[in-house]
């Protein structure tokens, strides 16, 4: 695949390690791969709660290691499974105030 095909891409849904299931990449490996191909952003997701703290650390690492040499941003999210109390407005409020950009409805604890 030509590397420039990924330039500017935004992936809205990527699962990374650490996770209860083994994933292909951890947060930092995914960030570095995304920077290499010129991706614009990635939203990291877990079924076990939140990822905005992990996204913050990736963005901080990117800033320290790469400076202003790319425009990549990692975004975090919250998934409203039982781990965070299900449909929990307080958890959503805190997640958004801590930087989450996506709120996922229940997945593993959904009744459907």
Please give the residue ranges for each predicted region:
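An N-terminally biased module of ancient metal coordination in phosphate/nucleic-acid-related enzymes
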Residues: 1-73
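Active-site beta-loop-alpha junctions enriched in small/polar residues
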Residues: 15-17, 47-49, 77-83, 106-110
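Extended substrate/RNA-proximal surfaces in nucleic-acid metabolism proteins
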Residues: 69-71, 81-112
């Amino acid at each position: 695949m030509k590397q420039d095909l990924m330039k500017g891409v935004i992936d809205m849904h990527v699962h990374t390690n650490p996770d209860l299931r083994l994933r292909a990449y951890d947060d930092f490996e995914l960030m570095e791969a995304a920077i290499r191909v010129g991706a614009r952003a990635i939203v990291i997701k877990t079924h076990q709660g939140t990822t905005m703290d992990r996204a913050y650390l990736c963005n901080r690492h990117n800033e320290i290691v790469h400076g202003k040499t790319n425009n990549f941003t990692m975004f975090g999210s919250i998934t409203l499974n039982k781990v965070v109390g299900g449909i929990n407005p307080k958890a959503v409020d805190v997640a958004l105030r801590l930087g989450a950009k996506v709120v996922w409805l229940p997945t593993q604890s959904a009744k459907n």
